[in-house]
Amino acid sequence: MYDSTPTIVVQDSVLADDLCQYIITFTKDAGPKPNLIASNGKNIRDEMRTSNGIGMDFGEDAVIDTIYKSMSEMCHLPISHAEPISIQRYRPGEEYKPHWDAFVHNEDLPKTIRLEECGNRAVTIIGCLNDSDAATVFPHLGLGIQSMQGRVIMFGNLDEDKEPHPLSMHMGTTPREGEKWIFTLWFREKPFMKTEKTLSKKKSEKKSTERHFDPDKHAANVMKKAKEMMKERGAMPI
């Protein structure tokens, strides 16, 4: 979780094609909205991230819940440490400017961040839902990772002192043609959601919208890819 050099893992063919399409269709039907940030007691459009998207809590859709589970297992952090998943659509001209995902402790943060209670964003996971000429770029590392359907990008955000790692700065470039679709999950150092027991109960009470693939088969595929990844490259440092 804490490292002198950011651990960046890229693994292809993790997300099934029909799962990616399900998430895109689900988000289109929900109606992507501009990203907002709190400023002086008001919500204003985020000029850093000009894409449109939606956020979803665990338990709102059984299919998307499989993403929480599989990504949790991949980064070795409990589902309860995850923030709500963010699903974003980027069109030409839309981008996410260079930024750090981790919070700075002396910043004037909204109370909803709950930094002291829940800790910082230790791990970020980006799932690529379609092929695009856009990329996730780490400027200080000279690294660009193109968006390819099924690809998962996972990286640590904190250094050995549990502070935002300078080299973890990254950006989402704009597509020259078409759209870029991704989801992002941030995992905190400590639980951010309700207890696992409550989450499991909530999940069991929810019914998914119509699905076009087998989520159990998808979960098995993700775990197979995760084991291959960890055998070849090692797990995220804990």
Residue ranges and their predicted role:
Residues M1-I238:
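Fe(II)/2-oxoglutarate oxygenase catalytic core
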